Amino acid sequence: ASSGLSDAPIRWIVDDCAKFVEREIRRGRKYDAVIMDPPSYGRGPSGEIWKLEENLFPFVELVTGVLSDEPLFFLINSYTTGLAPSVLTYLLETLVSRKYGGRTESQELGLPVTATGLALPCGATGRWTAE
């Protein structure tokens, strides 16, 4: 891998993440960092429906259950154009910062448009980091 991380202890989860997190909580496993890039909309194999606007808060709340006692960071990327960075700030402040302290920041994601020199909004990112 060109990233140089092929031997690093990283678990890439592309399955039903909520079920994975629930299993990890039952097993007592903990993680120092979380990177999530949830879809705007999706359907599970049994017809379950995922809508970012409805499911992100409870999912982030669930995921905090696998954070270690001294986590390093929690990153959320979203390419849902209607999701403001302030929503990610609220989620991370409410669910992570209140428990662990640290610092939260969020910003809009954009694609540069060469012809205009402007950026085309395409989502938001939010990051909590320990201090």
Q: Predicted regions span which residues?
A:
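General structural feature for long, well-ordered alpha-helical segments within catalytic domains
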Residues: 13-17, 59, 84, 88
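Mobile active-site "lid"/loop adjacent to the S-adenosyl-L-methionine
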Residues: 14, 31-62
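Active-site-proximal loop/turn and secondary-structure-junction residues that shape catalytic pockets
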Residues: 16-18, 40, 80
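S-adenosyl-L-methionine
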Residues: 1-35
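Short amphipathic alpha-helical segments
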Residues: 25-26, 46-49, 87-89
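C-terminal catalytic and target-recognition region of SAM-dependent MTase-like enzymes
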Residues: 70-131
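Conserved protein kinase catalytic core
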Residues: 22, 43, 83
